[in-house]
A protein has these predicted regions:
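Non-catalytic DNA-recognition/assembly elements of restriction-modification systems
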Residues: 1-25, 146-231
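A generic structural signal for residues embedded in beta-strands
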Residues: 79-80
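Sequence-specific dsDNA recognition surfaces
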Residues: 10-31, 45-74, 231
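A short, glycine/Asx- and small/polar-enriched loop/turn
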Residues: 35-38, 143
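ATP-grasp fold ATP-binding core
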Residues: 42
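Juxtamembrane/interface motifs at transmembrane-helix termini
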Residues: 27-31, 45, 74-75, 134-138, ...
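Basic, amphipathic alpha-helical recognition segments used for DNA target recognition
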Residues: 8-16, 47-54, 70, 74, ...
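Short, charged beta-turn/beta-strand-edge "cap" motif at the junction between a beta-strand
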Residues: 84-87
């Protein structure tokens, strides 16, 4: 675990883009047909596993020209933060998202987008738990910024990503359920987290731990960590 680090999400994301919805009465802003100057306009319902580039609706050039600063570049990580919480995907091309999606451009010198996407998928129970449930569940940038992200060097991240992608492909071929993927994610990140918790590389603040990690920490506490036995 020597190569592992922990940082808040705010320190590994170089740019945040929260989407919007243009005036739906402006028919010239929207199209169902992709074209050379249009961009996909992603909503939560468009988010599938892996890369996202095809959407139900697209913004025309006229629409895109209204919000050029909100164009999400290829490779950004997408996270649903309103209504349906915690779905994740990666922008497979330049696109625009609506207000229910938070796009994050990661510092790829620290974290690979695919690793970040899988990590957020693993962390989804915590995201759902923390969402502001008034009428519609919602997560703010401030809430996301403090998420503790645990990550190894880029080479090890790629190994983890390759293993998880292979497991996902096998799962899809055998038509296994989403629960199977959740178990795979928990196995991949849970073992790592257990070691990191033991060594103090993950914050032991139970308020910051995901519902998946919290039971691991509680079980470790009851058995007393080595560092605690020394004090």
């Amino acid at each position: 675990m020597e190569n592992w680090k922990q940082k808040p999400l705010s320190q590994v994301v170089s740019r945040w883009i929260r989407g919007t919805t243009l005036n739906r009465s402006r028919a010239d802003y929207y199209t169902k047909t992709p074209g050379p100057e249009s961009l996909p306009w992603a909503r939560v319902g468009d988010m599938k596993e892996g890369l996202l580039c095809e959407t139900e609706n697209y913004l025309t050039k006229e629409g895109v020209d209204q919000i050029p600063w909100l164009i999400v570049p290829e490779g950004a990580v997408l996270l649903s933060v309103s209504g349906t919480i915690g779905k994740s995907a990666i922008a497979g091309c330049d696109l625009v998202v609506n207000q229910a999606i938070q796009a994050m451009i990661f510092d790829e010198g620290q974290i690979l987008p695919e690793y970040a996407c899988f990590y957020l998928e693993f962390y989804r129970p915590w995201l759902i738990e923390r969402a502001n449930a008034v009428t519609v569940p919602n997560l703010t940038k401030e809430q996301l910024s403090g998420i503790p992200v645990v990550f190894p060097c880029l080479e090890e991240q790629q190994v983890i990503v390759d293993q998880l992608k292979r497991a996902r492909r096998l799962m899809q071929r055998s038509r296994r359920s989403e629960d199977t993927l959740n178990r795979i994610l928990e196995n991949a990140f849970g073992k790592m987290a257990r070691s990191a918790l033991k060594e103090g590389k993950i914050s032991r603040d139970e308020e910051l731990l995901s519902p998946v990690l919290r039971p691991i920490w509680v079980s470790l506490k009851t058995r007393a960590l080595p560092a605690e036995r020394e004090t």
